[in-house]
């Protein structure tokens, strides 16, 4: 009789284990995303990734130079004016490819060519009046937003493909993107030093 009123400790432990809530799929996805982000941050700091990126960047820039050498004289002026932008876009695409599509920002950069083509077609169909009204609407929304939300919105614009993501995902993507850019700067500085050191030798040998 008394035992029925007071259940044993073993039974209570078993029931508590049964009632333990399971981790939701969203929480599991966030944990997995953070794990991937941590591994990605470590990868950007390794010399091996930097060397691979530098080699791929040199190959990509060489292909760009080969395309420019086949252009006609009439297209030379346009090519020179857009050379800096093409080099920057090439460097960013190689950087995104180095991320192997594990991040949102890398996938956004790789898809930028397709979006640019679609944007040209859509821009021709838009009217001037709609653009003005939309611009005024964004300006009023910018004034109404609090300071923190406004800064997060700016951060979302700076990180490719992160304008409409949650705050935790935005911070993870921004952290990984910054680490990738830092690696990009180190690789470019190393390439610049190599080219500077090789320039006098090339001049002396005449090659």
Swiss-Prot record:
InterPro entries noted in UniProt: bHLH_AtIBH1-like, bHLH_dom, HLH_DNA-bd_sf, IBH1-like
Region (Disordered): 1-25
Occurrences of domain bHLH (ranges): 132-181
UniProt entry tagged with the keyword Coiled coil: no
Keywords (A to Z) from UniProt: DNA-binding, Nucleus, Transcription, Transcription regulation
A GO-annotated cellular component: nucleus
A GO MF label: protein dimerization activity
PROSITE patterns noted in UniProt: BHLH
Compartment(s) where it occurs, according to its Swiss-Prot or TrEMBL record: Nucleus
Function: Atypical bHLH transcription factor probably unable to bind DNA. Negatively regulates brassinosteroid signaling.
PANTHER family noted in UniProt: TRANSCRIPTION FACTOR BHLH149 (PTHR33124:SF41), TRANSCRIPTION FACTOR IBH1-LIKE 1 (PTHR33124)
Subunit structure: Homodimer. Interacts with PRE3.
Name of the protein in its database record: Transcription factor bHLH149
Organism the protein comes from: Arabidopsis thaliana
Gene responsible for this protein: BHLH149
């Amino acid at each position: 009789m008394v035992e029925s009123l007071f259940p044993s400790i073993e039974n209570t432990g078993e029931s508590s284990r049964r009632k333990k809530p399971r981790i939701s799929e969203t929480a599991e996805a966030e944990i997995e995303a953070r794990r991937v982000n941590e591994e990605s941050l470590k990868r950007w700091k390794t010399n091996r990734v930097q060397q691979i990126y530098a080699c791929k960047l040199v190959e990509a820039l060489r292909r760009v130079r080969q395309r420019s050498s086949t252009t006609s004289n009439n297209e030379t002026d346009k090519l020179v004016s857009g050379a800096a932008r093409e080099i920057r876009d090439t460097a960013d695409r190689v950087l995104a490819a180095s991320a192997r599509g594990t991040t949102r920002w890398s996938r956004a950069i790789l898809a930028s060519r397709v979006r640019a083509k679609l944007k040209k077609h859509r821009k021709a169909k838009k009217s001037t009046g709609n653009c003005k009204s939309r611009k005024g609407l964004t300006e009023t929304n910018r004034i109404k937003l609090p300071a923190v939300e406004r800064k997060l919105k700016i951060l979302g614009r700076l990180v490719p493909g992160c304008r409409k993501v949650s705050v935790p995902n935005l911070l993870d993507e921004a952290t990984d993107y910054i680490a990738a850019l830092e690696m990009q700067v180190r690789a470019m500085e190393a390439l610049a030093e190599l080219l500077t050191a090789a320039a006098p030798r090339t001049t002396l040998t005449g090659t």
